[in-house]
Amino acid sequence: MREIVHIQAGQCGNQVGAAFWSTIADEHGLDSAGIYHGTSEAQHERLNVYFNEAAGGKYVPRAVLVDLEPGTMDAVKSGKFGNLFRPDNIIYGQSGAGNIWAKGHYTEGAELADAVLDVVRREAEACDALQGFQLTHSLGGGTGSGMGTLLLSKIREEYPDRMMATFSVAPAPKSSDTVVEPYNATLSMHQLVENSDETFCIDNEALSSIFANTLKIKSPSYDDLNHLVSAVMAGVTTSFRFPGELNSDLRKLAVNMVPFPRLHFFMVGFAPLAAIGSSSFQAVSVPELTQQMFDANNMMVAADPRHGRYLTVAALFRGKVSMKEVDEQIRSVQTKNSAYFVEWIPDNVLKAVCSVPPKDLKMSATFIGNSTSIQEIFRRLGDQFSAMFRRKAFLHWYTGEGMDEMEFTEAESNMNDLVSEYQQYQEAGIDEGDEDYEIEEEKEPLEY
């Protein structure tokens, strides 16, 4: 009932996806062969949202794995949960996209797209009541960004009334893997604005700084980063996977979080932030979780919520947590920091509690914020994009695959529009700037 079909595209998307599947398989009591060993009814009750029961009581992820080169797939298959996936659902090319969005979207990726859509269709048909799709990918490369958004638009065309969520890894502001990242990301954003219903934004730099500042680990591996991302993904999807009342499916989450259809880019956070292996032995409480969850330094994307205002927020607590305490804590955050929440959406912080905590933790909290400050990412991308595009630098790699410069111009202006829309709602509701907001100081204002 209410199934979600998951698609992972490109190297980053597959590695993040693999981490997500191993995390939720653990949470639902599945071993690496997909056999259920759970101990509580809650683990089993909504298992079929993400898993399909196959012969012999084996549970198989409703996942489609896509890449334009074989390397990542070999890595996923040889990983701990590599045998979990259905072999026919793993589809890869040989040529690679060479970090060129146009190859993923128009040439190499387009050749593979029909084979992928056949598998997606088969997965969708195996569902009783498909609620929608989720895609994990990065925006800076060629396959995840180019082919990922191609699949997005094709699925949107075929299933217009189903929800579409993406977990999108944005290019980091200072450290880049490829010089053409701004092109790839801007062209992808152009697609995400139109074809995604909810996009959870993540970037490697924000993750690295969480490791450096909060966890005191100087050079984290990609596995460490993916562990953090999978913790957030597991947190975000908790209310779909376990019994609960609030935000119990993709559509309800979107209804609560997206006041205007284009403004569906969320920043995410997780608490308690514990490094891999060192399961946090310190006692955590709801006030501590709330403080850490709203802390600007713990956002998993390089945008500072203190520079904007929250349109909506969803806070999800897991473990033995009293709803009353959650209500009190969230109310206190809102009263002390009222300037950071738009006043024209009353009750814009949603709270949910799920009794099943993550593995090795007593309790945890996941944060989803629709903040106008997310425009910082798009601004930064836009600046980098126009610096190169003005000189037509590297354009031949794209026009050579049949792209037109017009598409670049359109993508650029769509992103600039998005920035202005966020800015407009950030300022809305204040009487033409004559009110100065002051934050009341109380005993311990949450650090923003």
From Swiss-Prot:
GTP binds at Q11, E69, S138, G142, T143, G144, N204, N226. SUPFAM superfamilies: Tubulin C-terminal domain-like, Tubulin nucleotide-binding domain-like. Dimer of alpha and beta chains. A typical microtubule is a hollow water-filled tube with an outer diameter of 25 nm and an inner diameter of 15 nM. Alpha-beta heterodimers associate head-to-tail to form protofilaments running lengthwise along the microtubule wall with the beta-tubulin subunit facing the microtubule plus end conferring a structural polarity. Microtubules usually have 13 protofilaments but different protofilament numbers can be found in some organisms and specialized cells. It is found in: Cytoplasm, Cytoskeleton. Tubulin is the major constituent of microtubules, a cylinder consisting of laterally associated linear protofilaments composed of alpha- and beta-tubulin heterodimers. Microtubules grow by the addition of GTP-tubulin dimers to the microtubule end, where a stabilizing cap forms. Below the cap, tubulin dimers are in GDP-bound state, owing to GTPase activity of alpha-tubulin. One of its GO terms (molecular function) is GTP binding. The gene is nda3. It comes from Schizosaccharomyces pombe (strain 972 / ATCC 24843) (Fission yeast). A cold-sensitive nda3 mutation reversibly blocks spindle formation and chromosome movement in mitosis. One of its GO terms (biological process) is mitotic spindle pole body duplication. Changing Y422H: Temperature sensitive. This is Tubulin beta chain. Belongs to the tubulin family. Disulfide bonds: none annotated. Mg(2+) binds at E69. Transmembrane segments: none annotated.
